[in-house]
Amino acid sequence: MGHYAPDGAYPEGIGYWDYGTSFNAMFLSAIEKAFGTDYGLSELPGFLKTGEYILHAVTPNLKNFAYSDNGGTAFLAPTMFWFYDKTKDASILYNQVQLYKKDGQKRIKKNRLAPAMLIWGASASLANPQKPVRLSWKAQGDNPVCFMRSSWNDSSAVYVGMKMGSPSVNHGHMDVGSFLLEADGVLWGMDMGGEEYNR
């Protein structure tokens, strides 16, 4: 869990965040239910901040900032409901609600952890999602990132995502310094993301 330090960015990108972090959340949820504590694991540096990484890595038109081996399609992430449950920050679910409104039934059918949203999100009010306050977010770590946007509720908003770091992290590419620019609903510049493993 040290890879989330210090600010919550995940070095392998947003898709591998979903895969790896979902196992962390399931484990922490299980031991907390069984023993009444997670033994401080959720308090490790950066871990409770990593939900903000996913929140800010999604563009106004619900695309991912795809660097390393990651694709550009945003996805429903049930683990974000775990972060809501732990932090009680309703704004962390903003993009999740937008994704569900767009084509939620299809997304839920394809997600093995969708039932966990019912448990972790039981107290969430999803009818009117709380808009996040911060228009920018940055994180240090193995692959530092920075995300900026002009608005949360305007699909024509300007959005910029930037990635620094190292190509030697797991699933890394030679993409240090890559960026994504979205404005007026158009992706003007982006990292092409990952290729198929078998090519």
PLM features: residue spans?
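C-terminal, non-catalytic macromolecule-binding modules
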Residues: G189-R199
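Short, electropositive, low-hydrophobicity segments enriched in small/polar residues
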Residues: E12, W17, Y197
